[in-house]
């Protein structure tokens, strides 16, 4: 994860002091790229702890195509939503978005249902009737040399109906002649401290899941950034993180899948980071 830390340092040293939508203020820099070879280990941040079950549950939720934050809570905590009404114990990274932007948009918001609109999972699994995930898998199987293996969440017609427009906008997949599946993701807006370690792990996991279904080996994950920023309320945490020495990357252990639908048979506990060790947690408030 050295490249990630180097980018944090670069933004601190060379970024612009800017205002932002949340009113928090940021140090921002535009147009960057980092790369990870998944054969060398799973790119989980070690200079602070990674909320791994949060990563897994969100991806499973995306792949279900859900628009309900309380469904994410069910996946994360493995309980029925009727048992998850205490948000001090059973909130998710999408709870604040549902309770703020979702409510502003007029979506249903109760103790057991918190709608977000046509967010990532809806676009992935039902973009005007198109299941992008199944199409992507079919296209990678039938035409591995193709240059149209795209997964997109940026549905312009629906942007204003989403509780949060997509930050990680699109990804492209590439099958090399040696049987490696690589992925490049473009992120228009990147919270470098809180969000990006989560995003790296999420797309590396998606890439590995797709490689598993396709009987390929995960290759490179390439992360391309538009507006890469550090919120002013996390500057001190970033400085502390940069003093820490990265630890050895873990290995991802997951079930063998014969189809993407087979994911329905598994839970967050079936995806394990073997050998994962990290420095203590570093916390900062999420700017919404």
Provide a role label for each language-model segment.
Residues 1-288:
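Terminal, non-catalytic protein-protein interaction segments that mediate quaternary/complex assembly
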